[in-house]
């Protein structure tokens, strides 16, 4: 049993390519550090692809499964994107902290669903609107069902994200979010128990939630707490005079080096926070100019100014 996926099918791998590496951030617990890159055009990372991917999934990020079903039954699926953007604009400006309008908050939603198969309970925009009274510290909350393999178990995955120029700064700032989530873990779980059933309509989804997340009185919930982290950062200057294919090879080599240089640092941060007993799932994506582009992308999305 597992929850239904919400990220739009057949979009992720059209835009993101994963880099293979052998580094580990966890010796004893499940966990991973996965690095991805976008396509390159005319010597630069193709940010337009990130805008398009974000826009194609915006309704699924903003609305619960139950709300999307209401639109579908009413024959109004064609207005979901428009209504999602309307809600985001009412929440605040592009890239405004804590509103659900940050690029990293959307990326952690997408990466956890697509690559971890930890499906959405509440995204950041839902946490900041429908569940605002609970003051969640998370950038999204997902649920990963056991697949029955050795060492696999049900996990409630709390999301954190940061996009900033230096990768080490992004790591540090993401762990500040994680520490806040950990300190309020009981409150976060209480919020899920009080709100999550209203966000689903599918009987199979509800069966999963009632079995593992919000069990009947007298039964215990069946999951561990884990963390999913999205980090965006500056790639650096791509060398001139190279073809785009050559630049993609250079990017792969650089990302392998990034993995080697920062895996041990992430592992130590986990230990410093006293969270060694939790699984961590990191997703890293370089940009040309992270600080500028995260704002530009979200401004284009909120304005509806994205070519699809």
Where do the PLM segments sit?
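A structured, charge-rich N-terminal accessory region that forms the first stable segment of a protein
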Residues: 2-83
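Short acidic, S/G/P-rich loop/turn micro-motifs used as interaction or catalytic elements
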Residues: 43-44, 164-166, 235-239, 290
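Glycine- and acidic-residue-rich phosphate-binding/metal-coordinating active-site segment common to enzymes
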Residues: 120-121, 128-210
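Extended, charged low-complexity segments
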Residues: 242-308
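Short amphipathic alpha-helical segments
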Residues: 46, 50, 76, 99-108, ...
């Amino acid at each position: 049993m597992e929850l239904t996926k919400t990220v739009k099918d057949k979009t992720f791998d059209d835009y993101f390519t994963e880099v293979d590496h052998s580094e580990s951030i966890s010796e004893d617990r499940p966990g991973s550090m996965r690095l991805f890159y976008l396509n390159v055009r005319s010597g630069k990372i193709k940010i337009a692809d990130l805008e398009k991917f974000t826009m194609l999934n915006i309704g699924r990020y903003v609305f619960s499964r139950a709300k999307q079903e209401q639109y579908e039954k009413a024959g109004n699926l064609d207005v979901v994107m428009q209504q999602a953007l309307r809600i985001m604009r009412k929440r605040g400006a592009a890239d405004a902290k804590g509103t659900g309008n940050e690029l990293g908050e959307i990326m952690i939603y997408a990466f956890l669903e697509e690559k971890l198969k930890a499906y959405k309970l509440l995204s950041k925009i839902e946490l900041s609107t429908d569940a605002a009274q609970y003051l969640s510290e998370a950038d999204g909350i997902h649920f990963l069902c056991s697949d029955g393999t050795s060492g696999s178990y049900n996990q409630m995955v709390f999301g954190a994200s940061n996009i900033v120029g230096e990768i080490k700064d992004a790591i540090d700032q993401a762990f500040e979010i994680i520490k806040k989530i950990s300190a309020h873990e009981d409150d976060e779980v209480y919020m899920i128990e009080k709100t999550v059933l209203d966000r689903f309509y599918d009987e199979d989804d509800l069966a999963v939630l009632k079995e593992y997340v919000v069990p009947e009185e007298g039964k215990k919930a069946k999951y561990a707490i884990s963390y999913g982290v999205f980090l965006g950062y500056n790639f650096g200057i791509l060398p001139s005079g190279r073809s785009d294919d050559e630049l993609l090879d250079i990017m792969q080599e650089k990302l392998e080096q990034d993995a080697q240089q920062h895996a041990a640092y992430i592992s130590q941060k986990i230990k410093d926070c006293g969270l060694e007993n939790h699984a961590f799932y990191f997703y890293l994506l370089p940009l040309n100019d992270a600080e500028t582009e995260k704002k530009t992308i979200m401004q284009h999305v909120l304005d509806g100014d994205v070519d699809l």
